[in-house]
Amino acid sequence: MGKYNFDEIIDRRGTSCNKWEYNVPEDVVPMWVADMDFAAAPEIREAMQKRLDHPVYGYTHHSKELKDAIVSWVGRRYHWDIQSEWLGFSPGVVPALVMSLLSLTTPGDRIVIMTPVYHPFYSSIEENGRVIINHQLDCDKNGYYSINFERLEAQIDNRCKAIMMCNPHNPVGRVFTGKELEELFAFAARHDIVVVADEIHSDLILEGEHIPAITLNEAARQRVILHHSASKTYNIPGLPVAFAIIPNEKLRHKYEEVAATMHAPFDTLSFDIRQRRGAGWKICGERRYL
C-alpha cells in the first residue's frame, strides 16, 4: 500500500465519535454508518494542520482555487467539462438536499423518493412541511432493484415538484444505467419535475460505470441539481463541505439564495487539498483495499 496504511487499527473512542460512542456498547462492532476507520490521507492532515496553525478561524469565501479544483476533478474523473459558475456549496449533502427542497418547493408540495432509501431523505421532506410520494423499487428474486415507471406514473399528480434520486443507490447498491436515467429524466420532463440527485457514493464503485445525471443530455442538465461531496471518497465526513452542480441558471440562483449565509473556515481548504493532493489515497489505495 506504500505510504497509505489501511491495516492500522485506530481507537476512535474519546473523540465524540458517533460511530463508536453514540449509544454503542463496548462489546459491539458498529457498522451502522458510512464512516470508515481509516486514517485521513497524510496530505490532508498536513494541510489542515498548517491552516490550524493560523490563529484566526474567520469567515471564508469559495475561492477560484476551490472551484478550479472541483472542475478539474470532475473533468479527470468523469471526462466532462463543467463551468465553475455552475457550482454551489453547502456544509454537506444532507443539508444540501434540504436546501434544494427549500429552493424548489413550498409547504404541501409532493416529493418522490425511491425506497428503501437513506433515512434523511424522509426527514428532509417531512420536517420541512412537504409530502412524500413513496415509490417502492421493484425487487426481483435475485435482489435486483429497479424503478417501475408505469407504477410511478400512477403515483404522481400536479402537486409533485421534485424527485429525490440516490445514485449509486443507498442502501440497495444499484448504479442506475444510462437507459434508466434517460427514462427518468424523460418522465421528469413530461411532468415538469426537477430531479435532486445525491451522487455522493459515485467514487466508490468497484465495478461498472457511474453516469452522472448531468452528462445525459442538455434537457437533463437543465432539470437537475446534482449533489456530491468528497467526504465519503476520502473518509472525512466531519469536514463540512459539499458541492452542487446546477447548470440551470434559474435553479442555481434559487439555491444560492438559500445557501448564502453558510460559511465554514476549513471547507475550501479541505476540498482543495483532497482533490489536488490526496487522490492517490482513494484511487490507488482505499478502493483497491476494499
Task: List where the protein language model places each region.
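PLP-dependent aminotransferase class I/II
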Residues: 62, 223-290
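N-terminal small-domain helix-loop-helix segment of the aminotransferase-like
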Residues: 2-92, 99
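Helix C-cap/helix->beta junction micro-motif
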Residues: 128, 190-191, 220
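Short acidic capping loops at alpha-helix termini that bridge into adjacent secondary structure
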Residues: 81-87, 107-110, 159, 221-224
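Conserved PLP-anchoring active-site segment centered on the Schiff-base-forming lysine
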Residues: 103-125
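Active-site phosphate-binding strand-loop segment of PLP-dependent enzymes
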Residues: 138-208
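A short helix-loop-beta submotif of the ANL/AMP-binding
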Residues: 127-133
